[in-house]
Design a protein with these regions (language model features):
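Catalytic-site signature of metal-activated, phosphate-bearing donor transferases
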Residues: 65-76, 96-236
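The conserved acidic donor/metal-binding loop of glycosyltransferases
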Residues: 90-94
């Protein structure tokens, strides 16, 4: 079984070391789409040798969701026949399981995996530390918005189509069996309690169950005021 990870990076010299340290523990290959970074992002990625491939692209110094979605779809095409599972995420998104390779093998009939999302928070960014980021930042809150389609099983499904923002897939897709922290029989499609996006409202009601889910996504965005403000300035 082969697991590949794809990540889009733009001046990620602070976060990328933690990202690579985590995903290199279970991925057979990591592809970094580098958006013409002007810091040490590329050098950090290349320090991992053959495990990491750097693919440059240029969005014209702007955050462009449509470019990112196209990169994701091309990633699936490129990985087909080479990888069994593909993880598609941002640099601050850490798919976590105590034994993820065994988990994927045990659920190899699932087409798409939606890890239970958590918004992780700390007072400051943990700079220049050894070990995993989740060894230092362990507090967060469940987040249905970050319960995203992040792992694709290429042995079951060939292509998927994200909606803008890549937090959800085209609702017209037939995914067959897929893994989601909210049981399918209580995950409504359409309006629910006057909320147009019914399933998001339902997830808010059962957030207390998220911590018991074996597959999680730890989103490390709010790691101190300085780190957050600098990221927003980059995207402005």
């Amino acid at each position: 079984m082969k697991v590949w990870a794809y990540v889009i990076a733009w001046n990620e010299e602070l976060m990328l070391p933690y990202y690579l340290r985590h995903y290199s523990t279970f991925c057979d290959k990591i592809i970094v789409y580098d958006n013409m970074s002007t810091d040490s992002t590329r050098m950090i990625a290349e320090s991992y040798g053959d495990l990491v491939e750097v693919v440059p692209f240029d969005s014209g110094e702007e955050f462009n969701d449509y470019v990112h979605i196209e990169l994701k779809r091309n990633s699936l095409k490129n990985a087909k026949g080479n990888a069994d599972f593909v993880i598609l995420c941002d640099c601050d998104e850490f798919v976590f399981h105590k034994d993820i390779r065994s988990f994927l093998n045990d659920n190899k009939d699932c087409s798409v995996f939606y890890p239970a999302g958590f918004q992780m928070i700390s007072d400051d960014f943990p700079k220049d530390l050894e070990g995993q980021l989740y060894d230092y930042v362990q507090w967060g809150e469940p987040s249905p918005w970050y319960t995203k389609p992040m792992i694709i099983n290429l042995n079951v499904i060939d292509d998927v189509n994200w909606v803008e923002g890549a937090h959800e897939l085209d609702p017209n897709l037939n995914l067959g069996s897929f893994w989601h922290p909210v049981p399918e029989d209580i995950r409504p499609i359409g309006e629910y309690k006057e909320h147009v996006w019914g399933k998001w409202q339902k997830m808010w009601e059962i957030l207390d169950t998220f911590n018991s889910k074996p597959l999680k996504m730890l989103h490390y965005k709010y790691l101190g005021a300085d780190y957050v403000s600098n990221r927003y300035k980059l995207y402005a």
